[in-house]
């Protein structure tokens, strides 16, 4: 099931990023269409403000205020595609962790720790798109979990040596 979902996420990411590239490529037509729809009242200004929420919020706002709607939408799609790829990678490493849990006599193994570190780093990177504050809190929690698992691996190694 997780493999199917990973493939689905990757396909979605590719389609979203491809759509962003197409929108950027058709920039003149898209900008003209959205501009006339705004002028005609068919689209409200608040309907397109979501695209102003790019990684650098000032950039998205400047693009929309300057009438470059296609570039704002395209960048938004590219960032969304990258976020979906990050989710697929997190799912991949988390599924490897649980697979190793099932096959191992102890969760405190170096391979599990390595996959856990990678998954937690990807989660911190993913949360950074929501804001720096939540990313810092997530990073501190991830650091605590990693330290607990490192200590558990050390205790497991000592236990294995005494047997």
Regions found by a protein language model. Give the residues of each.
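Cytosolic juxtamembrane helix and N-cap/initiation of the first transmembrane helix
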Residues: 1-40
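Transmembrane alpha-helical segments in integral membrane proteins
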Residues: 20, 25-28, 68-99, 140-143
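Membrane-helix boundary/juxtamembrane motif in polytopic membrane proteins
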Residues: 96-120, 161-162
């Amino acid at each position: 099931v997780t493999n199917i979902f990973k493939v689905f996420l990757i396909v979605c990411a590719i389609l979203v990023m491809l759509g962003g590239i197409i929108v950027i490529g058709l920039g003149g037509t898209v900008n003209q269409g959205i501009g006339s729809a705004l002028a005609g009242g068919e689209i409200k200004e608040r309907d397109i403000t979501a695209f102003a929420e790019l990684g650098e919020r000032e950039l998205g706002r400047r693009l929309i205020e300057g009438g470059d709607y296609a570039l704002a939408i395209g960048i938004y799609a590219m960032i969304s595609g990258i976020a979906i790829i990050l989710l697929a990678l997190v799912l991949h490493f988390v599924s490897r962790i649980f697979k190793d849990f099932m096959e191992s006599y102890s969760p405190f193994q170096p391979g599990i720790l390595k996959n856990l570190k990678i998954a937690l780093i990807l989660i911190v990177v993913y949360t950074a798109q929501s804001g720096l504050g939540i990313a810092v809190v997530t990073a501190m929690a991830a650091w605590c979990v990693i330290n607990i698992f490192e200590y558990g691996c050390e205790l497991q190694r000592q236990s294995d040596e005494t047997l």
